[in-house]
Amino acid sequence: MAEQRFYATGKRKTSIARVWLKPGEGNITVNRRTLDEYFGRETSKMVIRQPLELTDNMGKFDIMVNVCGGGPSGQAGAIKHGITKALLEADPELRGVLKKAGFITRDSRAKERKKYGRKGARARFQFSKR
């Protein structure tokens, strides 16, 4: 019999994370590296563990993540979103707790595009009166 695995994708800014959950001892692997090897900042690691700590599933699942695009902060957010969705697939009863914490909703904030005739998205070029 094949072991039970739960799959979900998470997104944040320009990062996309593919997450696989399987019952295990709590190992988190990101792009074939351990969580500590991949993320240097403690805040990123904390963000990733949030849904597991909230639902008391720390150490119950082995998590394998494949993440691409964006920077460390966006990737951490994408992994968090993916883990949340995978946990929901594993146990739909967690929906209320995760929804209340705001983990299910995809954070739609992204970089605003640069407009023509301007220096950036909102900033104007320097104005010279004379």
From Swiss-Prot:
GO terms for biological process: translation. One of its GO terms (cellular component) is cytosolic small ribosomal subunit. Pfam families: Ribosomal_S9 (PF00380). InterPro entries: Ribosomal_Su5_D2-typ_SF, Ribosomal_uS9, Ribosomal_uS9_bac/plastid, Ribosomal_uS9_CS, Ribsml_uS5_D2-typ_fold_subgr. GO terms for molecular function: RNA binding; structural constituent of ribosome. Residues 111-130 have a biased composition (Basic residues). Residues 110-130 are annotated as: Disordered. It comes from the Bacteria. Keywords: Ribonucleoprotein, Ribosomal protein. Belongs to the universal ribosomal protein uS9 family. HAMAP family: Ribosomal_uS9_B. This is Small ribosomal subunit protein uS9. It comes from Syntrophotalea carbinolica (strain DSM 2380 / NBRC 103641 / GraBd1).
